[in-house]
Amino acid sequence: MKIFKRLALILALASASLVAGAKDYLATDFGAKADGETLNTAIIQAAIDYISANGGGRLVFRGGDFVTGTIYIKNDVTLHIEAGARLLGSLNPWDYVRDPDANWTSMVFSIKQKNVGITGKGEINCRGFLVATKGVDYCHLGLIDDPLKLDRLQEAKRPENLHFYKCENITVTGITLRDPASWNQQYDKCRNIYVDGLTVDAKSYWNNDGIDIVDCSDVIIRNCDFDAADDVYCFKSHSKDGLSENILVENCRGRSSANVIKFGTYTLGKFKHFRFKNMLIEDTYRSAITIATVDGAQIEDVEIDGLRSLHTGNPIFIRTGSRRPGENPYMKDIVIKNVYAEVPFDKPDAGDMYEGPVEDLPRNVCPSGIQGIPGMPIQNLTLENIEIVYPGQADKNYAYRGSSKAELEAIPELEKSYPEFSNWKELPAWGFYIRHAEGITFKNVKITVAGEDYRPAIVADDVVGLNFQGVQINQPSADKKKKQIVTNNVKKFKNKK
């Protein structure tokens, strides 16, 4: 397939950029101090500039803690952080730069460069909680101008660990990224990105995403272990002419107090040719998979093959919406297969420092959702070889949503809302809720409810072309006589055992 040929080229470019004529330079030879106290920003930047101007190579950090503010990686330079070495962020918010091109703040930037990278078994640690809270203190003193919405500085004013903007041929491998003050690592309008073997611990402050890929093409992310307070593997588009394509994520683990695989929420441009393989998701508050287009984006040709989701609040949430008047998002040609998921009854991330919000209105456990809006249906979605175990125990005295025609048609669209599976609070099914969709296929889908649930297993409303092949519904014996598949305004429905 074309996508895999493109991705093979990325691997070749990544290898070439790391070995072609590379020379090693020790950061300490330039005068950098690994004492955990000295601010090394100017020395590290001078070293990077020298290496870039003299044919490129690796700036090696060996043994100890190197404190720095914002630094910029230049053409043909790789930061190599050995095991036992750390790049530590300065605790002074004024030591970080908000770059005028990227319009973000970061500890490590690379802006409009080629053949850049970060490698090694060491650590980059922004010490984000301390930086962010000190930033709030400075704001109260009048030293930083910010409205302090939600009692914190705006995301772009808090430093990320890494930010690459309009770069080509990026390699980031092996390192540990810890404690950003905002998003963790952002790749914006870049090409040819290779990310391998990262360990991410990003739960020190609000908005700690694991990785954000924004309008990028030709990307490989593999063999990573991410633990994040916010969305983990996050794909965004910030511009109407933006394009994200040819992206592979494989052999990765994620845990989140939000979502793990997440398209959005900024979705203005196009997304196509995405592949996810062999994913493990654990202890996640929201969804294992969220694919949402709510700002006008076009999402097509996405395949998720091989996913295990344990102790996660919702397995699958597919959504179109319309937050921007006049935009016409669409989503089509989505395949999700070879999935096993278990949904708990209790809140999966309870007790985490930045756990997902406790909801103020009651609901029973939500089903997986395939939810378009009128005129913008989900198109050509296939679920194959899926097994999901739900807890049941729904109590209609706690929250209730019936499945009569009138009750289904009274469910609000919420097309302008931020896309989360729990927006509707109570939904009328325990397994799958399908609404405003065309060409939906379930093949060898098995759903089990462990305890009694007053709702049917599957509700489909306003669907054209609903094809069930080998759908198996397992329920407590007390519910055997209850109708388990409810349809309203469904055309061309086939249910083949």
Predicted regions and their residues:
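Bacterial N-terminal signal peptides that target proteins for export
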Residues: 1-9
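Hydrophobic h-region of N-terminal signal peptides that target proteins for export
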Residues: 12-20
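Extracellular/periplasmic carbohydrate-active domains that bind, remodel
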Residues: 20-497
